[in-house]
Each structure stands twice: as C-alpha cells, then as structure tokens.
A protein has these predicted regions:
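Transmembrane alpha-helix boundary/anchor motif
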Residues: 21, 123, 127-131, 173, ...
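Bilayer-spanning, highly hydrophobic alpha-helical transmembrane segments
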Residues: 92, 98-178, 297-343
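Membrane interface segments of multi-pass transport proteins and intramembrane proteases
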Residues: 137-145, 180-200
C-alpha cells in the first residue's frame, strides 16, 4: 500500500471503523488504477472471508510486500498497536519516496548539461571542424598538431559512430546484467562505491539510516529484537553491508549483541557514531529510540552532502565543457593565425 493510504487507513481505524470498511472506502478512491484497484479488491475479499489484514497482505499476489512490513503488521495486530504502526509505516515509505525524488530532481540539471555538451561537441567535431580545416588542407598548408588531432578524432567518430553507439549501450546493458546476476561483481562494485569520497558516505548514511529506522519501527511494533534485526538486514541494497549485517544477525539470534557482533565480524564496519549509538541503545534498552534519532541524523546529513556533491559537480562539468570547446576552437583558429603569419 502507498504511504498516503497507510496513513488514511490508520485515521479510519482511529475513528472506530473496522478494517473492512476502511479498505472499502480506500478502494472506492482508486477505481481508475487497475492494478492497485485489483490489489485492494483482493484485500477486501480476503478480509470479508475472515482473514486478518496481515494474512490478506501476505496472501495477495498483486504486489510483493517487504517482510519487515508484513511482520510489523502481524505483531501490531496481535498487540493492539495497529494504528501507530500504520502511521509509522506510512511515514517511512513517504520519506523513502521523497529521498528518491530529491536525488532524481537533483541530477536532472547536471544530466541535461552533460547531454547538451556531448551533443554540441559531437556536432562541432563531426561537421564544423572538417569543413573549416578542409579549406586549409586544399591550400597544402601544414596544419598545427592540435588541429590534426581534432581532425583525427573527427574522422574516427564519423567513421565509427554506429559501432561506438552499439558499444556504449552494450557496456550499459552488460554492466546492469553483471550487477543483477553476478553476486561477485555486485560485491566488488558495491565495495568500490563505499570507498568513494562523499558518495561512499552518502551510501552508508542511506543504508544505515534505513536499517535504523526499520529496526526502530519494528521494535516499537513489538517484534522481538533478534527477529527485528534479521528482518531489518533484508533492506540493505549494498551487498557488502548486507553481508556484514546478515552475519552479525546470526550471532544476535544466538544471544549476542548486534554491536559486538558487528565489531568482531568480518567485512564492512559501520560508521563509528552508528556503532556507538547502537552499543548505547543495547546497554540502556533504548535501541528503538536511539536508532530512530540516528536515522533522522543520517537523513539530514545526506541532504547536506547531496547539495555539496552537486555544488562540486556543476563547476567541474562547466570546466570540462569549456576545456573541450576551447580545444576545438583552437583547432579551428590556429590554421588561420598560421596563414596570416605566413603571409
């Protein structure tokens, strides 16, 4: 279910409605959305048959539901905490969608600049430079080395653009396939990204923030600590971090603390402030509260770091574009200067 519907469902339940009545009301608002309407109809039918909201969500086949979400709903239904859990789940999914949208919007401007720059450079090299320098070649004048270099690039691009285009898309498809189907490749790439300046910290903040929020949410829902840790580890998208936490989660099931298990385990060691906060939470039995604060801290940190990354990216791209255009302009003007000096 989407974040707005989870919050709406919680408000209906808070007003005294039954789950069935609330689902029917929400279903009536989404009749034009075929897949989502089918999902809601499936829930309504199963609840009418006497199934709980958890069983209906777990049984329906329209959408795949995250395990942590299902288990939180299951425990919340048994403990009478359904309303606050639905609100928290709605807030979580809403914040995740907002972060994704912010990153997408932030990358639009640099991407547009990059595409325009590539297009402009390709046009100059493929069409403008050959026509201008061709005039000087006809005179038998020796062209400057930079002009010869640009002409060589122009000839190469003009003669091989189809192969280059196929190769470009082939690399993208090959990378995506390797990342999806080769766990070894995924681990190597994810490990490399974690070591990248700024980007690595952005990734770790996002991964740890999401883990912290979900673990906090499930503990508030009444899920046992060991079970909550195991479910929360499934939310990691970075293979290196997921492997470290999965190994630690197994030790937690055996009775160890998560902070100790991560400290003694192999693989990626999480950030120091996360480890300190986790250890403090486990010592004081306030894991849910402390990790909830950590999740908010990482969200704010990432917002600031994303702005910094973009502020560095834009001037770098402008400098790169200026350098490329400058080389092309120099390649066109130097033969003219050489001719004037010769005359």
């Amino acid at each position: 279910m989407c974040s707005s519907d989870l919050k709406e469902l919680s408000s209906y339940l808070n007003s005294g409605m039954t789950v069935l009545t609330a689902i029917k009301l929400i279903e009536g608002q989404h009749k034009k959305e075929k897949k989502y309407a089918s999902f809601l109809a499936s829930l309504r039918t199963m609840i009418e048959e006497g199934k709980s909201l958890y069983n209906a969500l777990a049984t329906q086949s329209v959408y795949s539901m995250p395990d942590f979400f299902l288990q939180s709903i299951n425990v919340a239904g048994q403990s009478g905490k359904m309303i606050p859990v639905l609100i928290q789940m709605g807030t979580f999914f809403s914040s995740q969608a907002k972060v994704k949208k912010q990153v997408g919007n932030a990358m639009v401007y640099p991407l547009v600049i990059f595409i325009v720059a590539i297009g402009m450079t390709a046009f100059l090299i493929a069409f403008v430079v050959p026509k201008i320098t061709g005039i000087f070649e006809d005179t038998g004048q020796k062209l400057p080395e930079i002009t010869q270099f640009v002409l060589g690039v122009s000839d190469f691009l003009s003669g091989n653009w189809i192969i280059l285009l196929i190769g470009f898309f082939g690399i993208i498809i090959g990378f995506k396939s390797a990342y999806k189907y080769s766990y070894t490749f995924k681990k190597i790439y994810d490990g490399f990204m974690l070591k990248m300046p700024i980007i690595g910290e952005l990734i770790q903040n996002h991964e740890l923030g999401r883990f912290s929020y979900i673990l906090s949410l499930m503990l508030d829902s009444g899920v046992s600590y060991a079970h909550a840790v195991k479910l929360a580890t499934t939310t990691f998208s970075n293979a290196m971090m997921k492997e470290s936490f999965e190994s630690a989660a197994e030790r937690v099931i055996e009775g160890n603390k998560l902070s100790h298990s991560l400290q003694r385990g192999k693989g990626v060691l999480p950030k120091r402030n996360f480890m300190q906060a986790l250890a403090l939470g486990e010592e004081s039995s306030e894991v849910a509260s402390i990790l909830g604060n950590i999740a908010e801290l990482y969200r704010e940190e990432n917002a600031d770091k994303l702005k910094l990354l973009l502020s560095l990216l834009e001037p770098f791209m402008m400098l790169f574009i200026g350098l490329v255009v400058g080389v092309i302009v120099a390649a066109m003007l130097l033969p003219i200067f050489s001719m004037n000096l010769g005359s």
